[in-house]
Regions:
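Ankyrin repeat start-site detector
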Residues: 73, 106-107, 139-140, 172-173, ...
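Intrinsically disordered, low-complexity regulatory regions that flank or link repeat-based scaffolds
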Residues: 1-72, 230-239
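Conserved ankyrin/ankyrin-like repeat signature
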Residues: 89, 122-123, 155-156, 189-190, ...
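Ankyrin-repeat intra-repeat helix-capping/turn positions
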Residues: 85, 119, 152, 185-186, ...
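Ankyrin repeat domain, specifically the short helix-to-loop turn at the C-terminus of the second helix
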Residues: 94-99, 125-132, 158-165, 192-200, ...
């Protein structure tokens, strides 16, 4: 299943939320005060329990069955295998030249995009080693780096940057990887990775005329990380 895309004008409703410190522990409060949890308390961990349970139920036999169903469509199988972390299947398809490493789905996502947004570093490494295009863009202009940064897959993002990914690439909505990380409440590691990069251009604006810092102030508890680049002159060489 493909990850949900970000809408450029999407803004969370923070009017009724209550801010708590990073150290706030709901479980500890539950132990000491029973059911008296303050209204508006929000967990910093975002997850889908139904999806997690579904994933736990899928064993190797299920995956092999899915692969068998797609065997006559190796391109579809490669895209699926990259997303599902089926490294051996990815390696087999590429070694047999059964599918092209930069094959695309209907939204122009490549196997590298899918592995990047799913956080599968070993698959990402294999795809790049086999010639995957780190600059490939989807119909909305997303690169694999955008996909990794949106979902806080920091190790994947770091690997892509080491292999010439454009840290300032902009989508059709003018979103950079930094914009996407800034809108994610769980993105501290990825924000630090991007902001510490000498080539970052934090002043870039999306089509709503917002910088990544603007988005972070509105949506993230880690907006203070942008102090890393405040008042600094970009040291990247002219293009």
């Amino acid at each position: 299943m493909e990850k949900e895309k970000v809408k450029d004008d999407e803004k969370p409703d923070l009017g009724n939320s209550v801010d708590f410190s990073e150290q706030f522990n709901q479980l500890e409060l539950l132990k000491t005060h029973g059911h008296l949890i303050p209204t508006g308390t929000q967990s910093l961990w975002v997850g889908n329990s139904d999806e997690d349970e579904e994933q736990e139920e899928k064993n190797e036999e299920w995956y092999l069955l899915q692969e068998k169903k797609m065997e006559k469509d190796p391109s579809k199988l490669l895209l699926w295998a990259a997303e599902k972390n089926r490294l051996a299947t990815v390696q087999r398809l590429l070694s047999e030249k059964a599918a092209e490493v930069n094959t695309r789905d209907e939204d122009e996502y490549t196997p590298l995009h899918r592995a990047a947004y799913s956080g599968h570093l070993d698959v990402v490494r294999e795809l790049v080693a086999q010639g995957a295009d780190v600059h490939a863009v989807t119909v909305d202009g997303w690169t694999p780096l955008h996909s990794a940064c949106k979902w806080n897959n920091t190790r994947v993002a770091s690997f892509l940057l080491q292999h010439d990914a454009d840290i300032n690439a902009q989508t059709k909505g003018l979103l950079t990887p930094l914009h996407l990380a800034a809108g994610n409440r769980d993105s501290r590691d990825t924000l630090e990775l991007l902001l510490m990069n000498r080539y970052i251009k934090p002043e870039l604006k999306n089509n709503s005329q917002e910088t990544a810092s603007d988005i972070a102030r509105r949506t993230s508890i880690y907006h203070y990380l942008f102090e890393i680049v405040e008042g600094c002159t970009n040291s990247s060489p002219p293009s």
